[in-house]
């Protein structure tokens, strides 16, 4: 009788099937990305419209959680909308909208037919001398300044002056579909070519499949209001091990410095008088983090930086009877975040300067678009009902006029009629205390800025242009006409601050440097990654500089690039290079006559050596510091506050845009049925093979002992 020895290992048929399945999965994992690249064309240079929230409502845009997809239709004139809104047979549509048609009228039509609209991709227009576009409201920061129904009701809600007369309010609307900005012309051309190749029918007939489609991802986690999203985030962070925060308050840092150093650990005595020079750092537009802000912010803070440099060069600044504080507020676009926080800190003893220390307040508004030599002085009519304040304001205006008399290119003008202050940080200080203050601006009534808080408030809007044949380094040092004009305004401001601080001997010698102004304008509006900005920053901040303009949206991750660059620019322009080593610069407490309470110390990259082979780092000592610009509403957990700004930004998981070819619904259905049938057939075959494995897969005999 013959006997054989067999094993008890896995069935050979099953082992083969497992190996085959593993190979298929591995191939799918390895080849998935390459297949996706063949199907989709990603759009890498886009900017989304995101959701923002305040105490009462939400604004902005979002997609569905899985993204929104639609057939692309190019709208180059308003008549093209008919296909999208009524005639097109393949809704929903993804509208590729020419920038010039991005108006309130068109958006209202699209908003009213959301069942046929999947989303919107907006191209950049080329503004001309007669065009205008401001997605902001006509009365910016309404309700958070000094005027209300109970105080100055005749000035409340911009009753006498619509400051932003051209504002269409689009940036403060809520859209249920995604809206993206296409920033790259080449990507726009690719989309239009895809549209022309696949989506244009012959002789007015409907196009045949496959069609060119676009998919936009911008799902927002927060809904309804700041109170709702903050409450949800609070509950998550309290009770969840892995909390999912759905929104964050808009926040950053204010930049401030003193003409004469003060001990920040103890603050000022009540009898010490301080002159405040203020301006704003931030701007915004309809699209996230696209905020060039040339006229609405950059020209003003560049002018103040140049004025600070000029004033610090005066020989007798250390003997002036009053100190000067330069402040650059963040978040003013969103209901005065920075200034309201500083006032709050001053009132509660959390800032070294108190409200009672403020002698006078000079603020720079929009100053780059003077239509003549005039620079207008705006004051508050309500606080001047107090005779003492009225006299102080009169002295302030007289000092400004005297300072301007020595600069023939600038003529200081008073308003002929009683008028409210334009949107300004001064309003938040006046809410807390009657002080003498003035806002300097290039407009007497409505803004001259036709692109207020829009994507087109760029260098070209304030006439900052360069000869085409110059290199970037030559552009950096090329003094433009705008730089000269702003330098003149900076000179007037510096001389006025000098006299307000008690100076008398050197006013006429104070002169702002046009070279400084032109470098700052170039860095903030044209190319941040330049040799001068590199020299004034710390080594680990180099990545903040890009070959593009800086954007001035406050955001939620702080400090932002703008804040850092302004901080170090101000330190470079007003501070002093010391002989401290890197270790001493990082810890100056061990060095005699150096104090962290009086100064800030920064180890910066420094200029190139003579051979331009390496930089010469140095330690800069200055009085420049940062102060938190987070609305007091979030400090106090008053998320429904009407006293303080409550703006928050929704979080999101993915921001993405891509195009691809889409098949007809019929073909998709057939593909699904065939795929499902193939799956069922495969399962049946697999089952049958597995059931008959002992017959189909016979194991070979193993050699063994044979007995007879």
UniProtKB/Swiss-Prot annotation:
Coiled coil: none annotated. The keyword Nucleotide-binding does not apply. Component of the gamma-secretase complex. The functional gamma-secretase complex is composed of at least four polypeptides: a presenilin homodimer (PSEN1 or PSEN2), nicastrin (NCSTN), APH1 (APH1A or APH1B) and PEN2. Binds to proteolytic processed C-terminal fragments C83 and C99 of the amyloid precursor protein (APP). Interacts with PSEN1 and PSEN2. It comes from the Eukaryota. The chain crosses the membrane at residues 669-689. GO terms for cellular component: cytoplasmic vesicle membrane; early endosome; endoplasmic reticulum; endoplasmic reticulum membrane; gamma-secretase complex; Golgi apparatus; Golgi membrane; lysosomal membrane. Its main location: membrane. N-glycosylated. InterPro entries: Ncstrn_small (IPR041084), Nicastrin (IPR008710). Residues 1-27 form the signal peptide. Glycans are attached at residues 44, 54, 128, 186, 203, 263, 386, 434, 463, 505, 529, 561, 572, 579, 593, 611. GO terms for biological process: adult behavior; amyloid precursor protein biosynthetic process; amyloid precursor protein catabolic process; amyloid precursor protein metabolic process; amyloid-beta formation; amyloid-beta metabolic process; cellular response to calcium ion; central nervous system myelination. GO terms for molecular function: ATPase binding; endopeptidase activator activity; growth factor receptor binding; peptidase activity; protein-macromolecule adaptor activity. Disruption phenotype: Full embryonic lethality. No embryos survive past 10.d dpc. At 9.5 dpc the embryos display a phenotype similar to that of Notch1-deficient mice, with defects in the development of the caudal part of the embryo and in somite segementation, defective vascular morphogenesis in the yolk sac, and patterning defects in the developing heart and neural tube. Assembly of the gamma-secretase complex and APP processing are disrupted. It comes from Mus musculus. This is Nicastrin. Residues 690-708 are cytoplasmic. Pfam families: Ncstrn_small, Nicastrin. It is a single-pass type I membrane protein. Gene3D superfamilies: Zn peptidases. Residues 28-668 are lumenal. Essential subunit of the gamma-secretase complex, an endoprotease complex that catalyzes the intramembrane cleavage of integral membrane proteins such as Notch receptors and APP (amyloid-beta precursor protein). The gamma-secretase complex plays a role in Notch and Wnt signaling cascades and regulation of downstream processes via its role in processing key regulatory proteins, and by regulating cytosolic CTNNB1 levels.
């Amino acid at each position: 009788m013959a006997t054989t020895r067999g094993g008890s290992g896995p069935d050979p048929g099953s082992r083969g099937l497992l190996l085959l399945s593993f190979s298929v999965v591995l191939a799918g994992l390895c080849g998935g990305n390459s297949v996706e690249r063949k199907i989709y064309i990603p759009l890498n240079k886009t900017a989304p419209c995101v959701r923002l929230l305040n105490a009462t409502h939400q604004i902005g845009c979002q997609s569905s959680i899985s993204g929104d997809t639609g057939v692309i239709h190019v709208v180059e004139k308003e008549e093209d909308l008919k296909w999208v809104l009524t005639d097109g047979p393949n809704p929903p549509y993804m509208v590729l909208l020419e920038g010039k048609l991005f108006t309130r009228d068109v958006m209202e039509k699209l908003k009213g037919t959301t069942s046929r609209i999947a989303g919107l991709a907006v191209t950049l227009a080329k503004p001309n001398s007669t065009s205008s576009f401001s997605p902001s409201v006509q009365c910016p920061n309404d309700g958070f300044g000094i005027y209300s129904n109970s105080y100055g009701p005749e000035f409340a809600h911009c009753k006498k002056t619509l400051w932003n007369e051209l504002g269409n309010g689009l940036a403060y609307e809520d859209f249920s579909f995604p809206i993206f900005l296409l920033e790259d012309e080449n990507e726009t051309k690719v989309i239009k070519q895809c549209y022309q190749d696949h989506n244009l029918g012959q002789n007015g007939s409907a196009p045949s499949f496959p069609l060119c489609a676009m998919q936009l991802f911008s799902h927002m986690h927060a809904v309804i209001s700041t109170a709702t999203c903050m409450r949800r985030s609070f509950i998550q962070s309290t009770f969840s091990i892995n909390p999912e925060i759905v929104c964050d308050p808009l926040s950053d840092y204010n930049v401030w410095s003193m003409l004469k150093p003060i001990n920040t650990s103890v603050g000022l005595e009540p009898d010490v008088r301080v002159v405040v020079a203020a301006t704003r750092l931030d701007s915004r537009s309809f699209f996230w983090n696209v905020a060039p802000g040339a006229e609405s912010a950059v020209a003003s803070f560049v002018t103040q930086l140049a004025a600070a440099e000029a004033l610090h060069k005066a020989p007798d600044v250390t003997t002036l009877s009053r100190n000067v504080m330069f402040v650059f507020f963040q978040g003013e676009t969103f209901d005065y975040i920075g200034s309201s926080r500083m006032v709050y800190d001053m009132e509660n003893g959390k800032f070294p300067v108190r409200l009672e220390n403020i002698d006078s307040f000079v603020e720079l508004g929009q100053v780059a678009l003077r239509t003549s030599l005039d620079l207008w002085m705006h004051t508050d009519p309500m606080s001047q009902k107090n005779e003492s304040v009225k006299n102080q304001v009169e002295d302030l205006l007289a000092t400004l006029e005297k300072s301007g008399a020595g600069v023939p290119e600038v003529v200081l003008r008073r308003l002929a009629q009683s008028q409210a202050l334009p949107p300004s940080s001064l309003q938040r200080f006046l809410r807390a205390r009657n002080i003498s203050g003035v806002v300097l601006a290039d407009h007497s009534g409505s803004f001259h800025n036709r692109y207020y808080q829009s994507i087109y408030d760029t260098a070209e809007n304030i006439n900052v242009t360069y000869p085409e044949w110059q290199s970037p380094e030559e552009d950096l040092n090329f003094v433009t006409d705008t730089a000269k004009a702003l330098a003149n305004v900076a000179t007037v401001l510096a001389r006025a601050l000098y006299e307000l601080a008690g100076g008398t001997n050197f006013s006429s010698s104070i002169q702002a440097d046009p070279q400084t102004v032109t470098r700052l304008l170039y860095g903030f509006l044209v190319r941040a990654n330049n040799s001068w900005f590199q020299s004034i920053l710390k080594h680990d901040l180099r990545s903040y500089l890009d070959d593009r303009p800086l954007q001035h949206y406050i955001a939620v991750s702080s400090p932002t690039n703008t804040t850092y660059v302004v901080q170090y620019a101000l330190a470079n322009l007003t501070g002093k290079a010391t002989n401290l080593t890197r270790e001493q610069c990082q810890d100056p407490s061990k060095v005699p006559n150096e104090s962290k309470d009086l100064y800030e110390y920064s180890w910066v990259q420094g200029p190139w050596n003579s051979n331009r082979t390496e930089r010469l780092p140095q330690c800069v000592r200055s009085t420049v510091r940062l102060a938190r610009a987070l609305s007091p509403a979030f400090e106090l957990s008053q998320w429904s506050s009407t006293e303080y700004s409550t703006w928050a930004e929704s979080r999101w998981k993915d921001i993405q845009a891509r195009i691809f070819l889409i098949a007809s619904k019929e073909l998709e259905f057939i593909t699904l049925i065939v795929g499902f049938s193939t799956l069922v057939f495969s399962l049946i075959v697999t089952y049958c093979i597995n059931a008959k494995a002992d017959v189909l897969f016979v194991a070979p005999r193993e050699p063994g002992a044979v007995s007879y």
